[in-house]
Design a protein with these regions (language model features):
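Functionally constrained cores in energy, signaling, and assembly domains
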Residues: 18, 54, 101
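Histidine-centered nuclease catalytic patch
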Residues: 1-41
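Short, Lys/Arg-enriched charge-dense amphipathic segments
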Residues: 12-22, 58-64, 139-143
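C-terminal, charged low-complexity interaction regions
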Residues: 74-152
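Short, surface-exposed, charge-dense and proline/glycine-enriched linear segments
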Residues: 19-30, 66-69, 73-74, 146-152
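Long, low-complexity, intrinsically disordered segments enriched in glycines and aromatic residues
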Residues: 29-75, 83-91
Length: 152
C-alpha cells in the first residue's frame, strides 16, 4: 500500500493515511479504471478522513454505490476518487460484502429473539467503530447497522 497524508501536516506522521493502489499496479490499466489515490493524483479532497462529521456525510445506495448529499464530498467520492468504478465492480463488491455480513448475522441469530439480533448488531457495530476492527468495505456495513439501530 501507499501512504497519503494531509499536505498541511507534511512532517506530522500521525496524520498519514494508508491508501490502496487503486488498480494502478496492473500494466495497461486505463486512467478511468483507477481509483482512490491512483485516480486522485495531486487533487485536493474536501472530505477529511480524520473528521467523523465529514466521513458521516458518505452514504450508500442499495446497489452498493457510494455518494453524498454534500456536492463537494460527492465529487470527491464519485469523481476524484472514482469509488463507483465499474471496471473494478466496486458497487457490486460493497453490496456483496454487506450481503455476506447480513447473512452471517442472520445465521448467528436464527431462531433467537429480536433482542438477540439487536445485541449482535450492537456487538458488530462496537467492533467496527469503537475497537476499530475495520475491514475492506466496512463503511457499508456500518451504515446499514446504523440504520437498523437508528443511529445518525
Amino acid at each position: 500500500d501507499e501512504i497519503e497524508h494531509d499536505k498541511k501536516a507534511t512532517l506530522e506522521f500521525k496524520w498519514m493515511l494508508g491508501v490502496c493502489y487503486g488498480n494502478s499496479i496492473e500494466k495497461g490499466v486505463k486512467p478511468e479504471d483507477t481509483t482512490c489515490d491512483a485516480h486522485k493524483g495531486n487533487a485536493e479532497l474536501t472530505i477529511n478522513p480524520f473528521d467523523e462529521l465529514s466521513v458521516r456525510k458518505i452514504k450508500y445506495k442499495a446497489d452498493g454505490s457510494i455518494y453524498s448529499d454534500d456536492a463537494d464530498i460527492n465529487k470527491d467520492v464519485a469523481e476524484t476518487l472514482n469509488l463507483n468504478c465499474q471496471a473494478l465492480s466496486l458497487p457490486q463488491t460493497r453490496k456483496n460484502v454487506l450481503m455476506a455480513e447480513k447473512n452471517r448475522i442472520m445465521r448467528k441469530c436464527k431462531g433467537k429473539s429480536q433482542d438477540a439480533f439487536m445485541r449482535e448488531l450492537e456487538r458488530t457495530y462496537a467492533s467496527l467503530t469503537q475497537e476499530r476492527n475495520l475491514t475492506p468495505y466496512c463503511g457499508i456495513i456500518i451504515s446499514w447497522i446504523e440504520s437498523k439501530l437508528k443511529i445518525s
